[in-house]
């Protein structure tokens, strides 16, 4: 049953669409300027790991895990990116609210990842917009315990406005080795409609994907400067893509979790 509200006929509908695009563009520009140093450091860390034949790991819970999928087995992306998918923390579970329950549950993520073979010299990227729940904090702490460099991709505006829900008493940005602020607002959504109190249309996925792909591009440039061929996937829908990718995957089989 839909909820009836008084009709509001003052909308410029196209302006709402334009507003979202403008919000994204403005925030991308702001991130590009304000996070330049952090992204450069992240690119150096990725390049260092790949130079030494180490892996890049990535984790996010629920919708934050979309960026895990975005970096893994991706045309134009790095082959040695190993995903951390924790049961119950991906968007294919039913009921979907289970993701929120388990992300907040102290000890759940820590128990789920204790056999993940992160090694010293690896890089671990943990994505959480609010950064307040137990799961991303526990994954980040595990990565540090294992000797990896831990990068937090989060919203400082959002995270600093909320209390931690982890028994550690910490938020993600407080436990990572490097913090990249994605520029998303508190609550993530950015379009405000007249007559409707709740903002709509989140931005963190777009901002986060742009940040990570930009870091990968710079890391590949660093590898080339060092005389190292970047291990990058070709689209499987281009001629020769399957063969190219098979060679890359054989190199990392047994180390990258999805292989």
Question: What feature does the model see in each segment?
Answer:
Residues 38, 42, 76-79, 221-259:
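Active-site phosphate/pyrophosphate-binding segments
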Residues 34-51, 112:
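A short, well-structured juxtamembrane/interface segment
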Residues 15-19, 51, 56:
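N-terminal glycine-rich anion-binding loops that anchor highly charged ligand groups
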Residues 15-34:
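Generic N-terminal amphipathic, Lys/Arg-enriched alpha-helix
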Residues 57-216:
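Glycine-rich phosphate-binding loops that contact phosphosugars or nucleotide phosphates
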Residues 11-12:
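Short, positively charged and aromatic/hydrophobic N-terminal segments
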């Amino acid at each position: 049953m839909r909820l009836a509200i008084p009709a509001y006929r003052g909308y410029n509908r196209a302006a709402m669409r334009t507003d979202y695009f403008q919000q994204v563009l403005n925030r991308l520009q702001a991130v590009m300027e304000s996070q330049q140093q952090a992204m450069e450091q992240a690119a150096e860390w990725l390049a260092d790991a790949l130079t030494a034949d180490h892996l890049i790991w990535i984790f996010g819970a629920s919708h934050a895990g979309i960026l895990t999928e975005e970096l893994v087995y991706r045309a134009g992306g790095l082959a040695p990116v190993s995903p951390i998918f924790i049961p119950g923390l991906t968007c294919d579970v039913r009921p979907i609210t289970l993701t929120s329950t388990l992300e907040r549950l102290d000890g759940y993520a820590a128990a789920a990842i204790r056999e993940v073979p992160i090694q010293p010299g690896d890089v671990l990227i943990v994505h959480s917009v609010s950064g307040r729940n137990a799961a991303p904090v526990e994954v980040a702490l595990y990565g540090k315990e294992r000797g990896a460099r831990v990068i937090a991709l989060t919203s400082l505006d959002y995270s600093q406005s909320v209390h931690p829900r982890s028994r550690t008493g910490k938020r993600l940005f407080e436990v990572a080795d490097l913090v990249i602020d994605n520029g998303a607002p508190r609550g993530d959504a950015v379009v405000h409609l007249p007559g409707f109190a709740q903002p709509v249309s989140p931005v963190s996925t777009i901002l986060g994907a742009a940040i990570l792909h930009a870091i990968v591009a710079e890391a590949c440039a660093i590898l080339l400067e060092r005389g190292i061929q970047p291990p990058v996937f070709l689209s499987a829908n281009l001629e020769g893509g399957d063969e190219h990718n098979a060679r890359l995957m054989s190199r990392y089989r047994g180390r990258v979790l999805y292989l």
